[in-house]
């Protein structure tokens, strides 16, 4: 019997991480996959990345626009409310067998709430992880609203068990974002330098810095410290614009001050293959993106992880954690650039997550008893 699955996506990040899983499901005769699109995908400020989903020829079963222009804290809460209404309508119309979610963003929480009230089983990827920010609370809330958990690490599995999730509903599959990394043939350094107009004699830094909503009052000072430290280290910088969380507009204001700097390339959005190319060809990664924690080790790329956003996440040996001060960031960058290039073991998996997810999604029990969820103790 064919299973109908809806994946919810709200950002370039979650879609990029899940792309190989979605492709594997799309190729299957056992799965009828469609995608419900919301959030940053539908905003020109973030690259109208819904067009990537269309280009990949996935079926889109719903589009739920939200207002991301308002930079207030309340805008995130209001967006979740709008998305809850939208997901309810889409799920009620489409009647999927499973709603598939990833991570810790508000749109995933809204989708989980809608699904459980419509008696639709929820499968959650990347549950059980810690970060130490508001994202962690949302992630754990989604886990408690989910019926199955596809986790990246053993520690995440054990954390979910301690949270009261039943062990038989938890499967360690690895991080889905690693699959495409293992398959993609990256550009040579010469081609990469030509693409971005870089001096081949200078080193390259991939910079991604997202806002932490509890620290929005200091976010401009934080980002100035980050980019100034990178420039003081004589690095050429590929700077990706931040996400839509509260405070992102303040980071973009600072980024615009460097738009004419000869060593800075400001990028609104990178397609997934281009982003993988950046990971492969950079000499150091700087900022607070989860890609530095999860994906960079697969490229043996040293990472200077700044501040609290990924504070409690598991990390491989390539990550150097520093405070959000100019001196600490400068010291971290020098350490990262002076470390020998070695092969790191990535604690988040082996790049075979897509097949594991497919095998599970076509076989996990979906009987009505699975919906009657209660704590294991």
Swiss-Prot record:
<dbReference type="InterPro" id="IPR029767">
    <property type="entry name" value="WecB-like"/>
</dbReference>
<dbReference type="GO" id="GO:0004553">
    <property type="term" value="F:hydrolase activity, hydrolyzing O-glycosyl compounds"/>
</dbReference>
<dbReference type="GO" id="GO:0016051">
    <property type="term" value="P:carbohydrate biosynthetic process"/>
</dbReference>
<dbReference type="GO" id="GO:0006047">
    <property type="term" value="P:UDP-N-acetylglucosamine metabolic process"/>
</dbReference>
<keyword id="KW-0843">Virulence</keyword>
<comment type="similarity">
    <text>Belongs to the UDP-N-acetylglucosamine 2-epimerase family.</text>
</comment>
<dbReference type="GO" id="GO:0102388">
    <property type="term" value="F:UDP-N,N'-diacetylbacillosamine 2-epimerase activity"/>
</dbReference>
<dbReference type="Pfam" id="PF02350">
    <property type="entry name" value="Epimerase_2"/>
</dbReference>
<dbReference type="InterPro" id="IPR003331">
    <property type="entry name" value="UDP_GlcNAc_Epimerase_2_dom"/>
</dbReference>
<comment type="function">
    <text>Involved in biosynthesis of legionaminic acid (5,7-diamino-3,5,7,9-tetradeoxy-D-glycero-D-galacto-non-2-ulosonic acid)(Leg), a sialic acid-like derivative that is incorporated into virulence-associated cell surface glycoconjugates such as lipopolysaccharide (LPS) which could be a key determinant in the ability of L.pneumophila to inhibit the fusion of phagosomes with lysosomes. LPS contains a majority alpha2,4-linked homomer of legionaminic acid. Catalyzes the conversion of UDP-N,N'-diacetylbacillosamine (Bac2Ac4Ac) into 2,4-diacetamido-2,4,6-trideoxymannose and UDP.</text>
</comment>
<keyword id="KW-0378">Hydrolase</keyword>
<dbReference type="InterPro" id="IPR020004">
    <property type="entry name" value="UDP-GlcNAc_Epase"/>
</dbReference>
<protein>
    <recommendedName>
        <fullName>UDP-N,N'-diacetylbacillosamine 2-epimerase (hydrolyzing)</fullName>
        <ecNumber>3.2.1.184</ecNumber>
    </recommendedName>
</protein>
């Amino acid at each position: 019997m064919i299973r109908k699955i809806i994946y919810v996506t709200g950002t370039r990040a979650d879609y990029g991480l899940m792309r190989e899983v979605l492709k594997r499901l799309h190729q299957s005769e056992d799965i009828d996959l469609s995608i419900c699109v919301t959030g940053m995908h539908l905003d020109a400020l973030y690259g109208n990345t819904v067009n990537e989903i269309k280009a990949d020829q996935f079926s889109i079963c719903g589009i739920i626009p939200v207002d991301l222009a308002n930079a207030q804290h309340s805008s995130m809460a209001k967006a979740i409310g709008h998305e809850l209404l939208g997901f309810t309508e889409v799920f009620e119309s489409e009647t999927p067998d499973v709603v598939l979610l990833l991570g810790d963003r508000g749109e995933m929480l809204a989708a989980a709430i809608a699904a459980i009230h419509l008696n639709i089983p929820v499968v959650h990827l990347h549950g059980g992880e810690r970060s130490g920010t508001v994202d962690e609370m949302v992630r754990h809330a989604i886990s408690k609203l989910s019926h199955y958990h596809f986790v990246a690490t053993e520690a995440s599995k054990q954390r979910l068990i301690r949270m009261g999730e039943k062990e038989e509903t938890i499967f360690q599959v690895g991080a889905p974002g690693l699959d495409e990394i293992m398959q993609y043939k990256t550009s040579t350094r010469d081609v990469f330098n030509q693409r971005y107009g870089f001096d081949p004699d200078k080193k390259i830094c991939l910079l991604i810095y997202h806002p932490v909503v509890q620290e929005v009052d200091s976010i401009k000072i934080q980002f100035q410290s980050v980019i100034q430290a990178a420039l003081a280290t004589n690095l050429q910088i590929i700077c990706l614009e931040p996400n839509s969380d509260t405070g992102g507009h303040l980071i973009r204001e600072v980024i615009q001050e460097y738009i004419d700097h000869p060593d800075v390339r400001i990028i609104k959005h990178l397609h997934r293959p281009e982003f993988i190319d950046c990971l492969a060809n950079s000499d150091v990664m700087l900022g607070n993106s989860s890609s530095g924690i999860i994906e960079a080790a697969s490229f043996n790329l040293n990472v200077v992880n700044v501040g609290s956003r990924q504070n409690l996440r598991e990390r491989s040996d390539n990550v150097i954690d520093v405070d959000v001060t100019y001196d600490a960031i400068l010291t971290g960058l020098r350490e990262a650039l002076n470390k020998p290039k070695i092969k790191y073991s990535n604690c988040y998996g082996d790049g075979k997550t897509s097949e594991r997810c497919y095998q599970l999604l076509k076989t996990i029990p979906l009987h009505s008893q699975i919906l009657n969820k209660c704590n294991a103790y």
